[in-house]
């Protein structure tokens, strides 16, 4: 299926790029910062704002060195309800990544339009199965995986009732070195799975997501922050509002530039054709009744007369009007055979 519907938006072939501002954990555990992220994402032109939903104790071992960090960034269920309501109020789609099984039910009850699965959970089949059974579209990031693992994950989703799947090419290094971005994998995934494919970006800057649209990405996900200098794990590699807005604008420009793929003269160049192409013209003065030959004709701009591609047709034809040097020769100037 080359096109699916998320909320009121179609995503896939022939549709505008679906742009997700990945708020992630950049709210720093503060609902007010979260709301500001929602507001700024809308102002920047994002189609959706996305967060990460979890209960730390169900997500990370208490013995992990990262437990306290993630605990400090955790938002409550009530706060996610509040963020979703605020997003809907200002007209931007709310999506979240469930990082534990409980949050699948919570987000489904909130009636999120789609589920996002993190790259690290591509092989977490209990989560895939539970999400698939909601019947909601699934956006699946594919960092750290190979085609076999992606194929198996897609089959798990499909076998549990999910029919609307989007794959995101992703490299799970933060930030991703440019030599590892491998944007051509977007084309590989499209050719194998025949479903919408996008790109989840972790590079510095905005070049990679913009280029990925030219390579066929249907969805772009980019980390989004209010300020790159804020404390937290993802702020430094995220796009701030100015950068994100520039990315959105550039993506929309790329969409215009890509066009239909049909090779025809464009409206903006039609007037140029006459001036840029050549006509058959008189090389010297030509008398009425004289035969046209390579000795008395030349090929010059503008292209208002007989096109040069018809040279073989007009050679040895008589001319019925006197022509001065550099006069354009028209079909009406020729006598019959």
Swiss-Prot record:
Gene3D superfamilies: Aldolase class I, Antifreeze-like/N-acetylneuraminic acid synthase C-terminal domain. Residues 279-337 form the AFP-like domain. InterPro entries: AFP_Neu5c_C (IPR006190), AFP_Neu5c_C_sf (IPR036732), Aldolase_TIM (IPR013785), Neu5Ac_N (IPR013132), Nonulosonic_Acid_Synth (IPR051690), SAF (IPR013974). Disulfide bonds: none annotated. PROSITE patterns: AFP_LIKE (PS50844). GO terms for molecular function: N-acylneuraminate-9-phosphate synthase activity. GO terms for biological process: carbohydrate biosynthetic process; glycosylation. It comes from the Archaea. To B.subtilis SpsE. PANTHER family: N-ACETYLNEURAMINATE SYNTHASE (PTHR42966), SIALIC ACID SYNTHASE (PTHR42966:SF1). This is Uncharacterized protein MJ1065. It comes from Methanocaldococcus jannaschii (strain ATCC 43067 / DSM 2661 / JAL-1 / JCM 10045 / NBRC 100440) (Methanococcus jannaschii).
